[in-house]
Amino acid sequence: MVTKSKRPKSGDRSGREPGNAGPIEQGDYLDGQLLIAMPVMEDERFARSVIYICAHSSEGAMGIIVNRPAGSIDFPELLVQLDIVEKPEQIKLPDHAESMKVLRGGPVETGRGFVLHSSDFFIKDATLPIDDGISLTATVDILRAIASGAGPKHAILALGYAGWAPGQLETEIQDNGWLHCDADADLVFGNDIEEKYDRALHKLGIEPGMLSAEAGHA
């Protein structure tokens, strides 16, 4: 069942440099940005991953991997598994829901769902506005809304999330595990999942081949 999860509070981003690929300073938080895994990433769960940071503060960080499909399951099938509908053919999903991707959002709480969506949809006490017109909702109500045609225009559903303890993400960035850059809705919600990693690098002016050759020196 999709349920609300604890997450660190959003931090003050006033001192953040947009599009910065280097280390971050203490108190300079990355919610609303993308993390891009470096080729030296040893954890296979995050290899070539692009992660949208939903919350980052002194309490830690939480994000959703936006380029890792959850096998062959699609959104209508998931609605059946969650008992929102009995059969996919019983409902007529709007076009954006028919193509809605189900992703592996990360290794934490993989039995729970988290919906990243455009900011044209809001549920009081459930929706977290993040940045650049992107919000996060983690209740089953948003799935019912999408199924009935009353949901957000753009959305992706992720099973699980990526989480970091206090200071852990900062350390990984300093150790050249991640690059980071500004996010945009077209990249986050795009259907070209296989291209998201290269597109994120291009936002920093980096060619993937060049990054591979210079791993650890970005």
Swiss-Prot record:
> InterPro entries per the record?
AlgH-like
According to the record, the residues making up region (Disordered) are 1-26
Which Gene Ontology cellular component terms are annotated? cytosol
Tell me where on the tree of life, at the top rank, the source sits: Bacteria
Pfam families xrefs: DUF179
Name the family the entry cites. Belongs to the UPF0301 (AlgH) family.
What protein name does the entry list?
Answer: UPF0301 protein RPB_4502
Query: To which species is this protein native?
Result: Rhodopseudomonas palustris (strain HaA2)
